[in-house]
Amino acid sequence: MEQKLIRKRQDEFEAEGKEYAAYYDNEETILEERSKVPYLHFGSFDRQEWLQLSFSTRLGGVSDGYLSSLNLGWDRGEGRENVCENYRRYCESIGADHQKLVLSDQVHETTVKYVDPNFCAGANIEKKLKAVDGMLTDIPELLLATSYADCVPLFFCDPKKKIIASSHSGWKGTVAGIGEVTVHKMQEMGCTLSDIEVLIGPSICQSCYEVSGD
């Protein structure tokens, strides 16, 4: 089998008064640094004009100290207003309405839920889903916001049915098959397997990944 070598490239940029370098191991990952809040987007999904996929960095927010500066986690001991402001800034940078965010508590399981406007975070940016690691929808303008540390992001779309999904795949979710569960949920909504496109987002590499004995 022929193996294609993908060259690693480096982008240098300045943010918050500091110099940074970003490394990529593929040609589909693009760092958007023209806005106040830098973010990643991906060529394969950019070609789908009906959807937008972006991935935050830790730059461009209001958080201090080790959380500097775009902390989007609610359980890091930071004041709620800072986290909300970071969400507002990020959504503004990608041209989206923060009130249409859909947020969930992720628990490393395989629950994938269909979401509609009833689950939107609203002006106060409230998390309305509990114990959900994957979301899917066919409603335009909803922002499915899933969170990752070193876990694997899985993004799905069906260009024909205009259905999207996003799943958080830690090692437990990966072993339990959350990717397969997400695809099955899309099929239940009428998607054909061959029409579903999947993108694996940025995550920790194998050489750096450590897990406990279980």
For each feature predicted by the language model, list its residue ranges.
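Active-site microenvironment for binding and transforming phosphate-containing groups
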Residues: 1-214
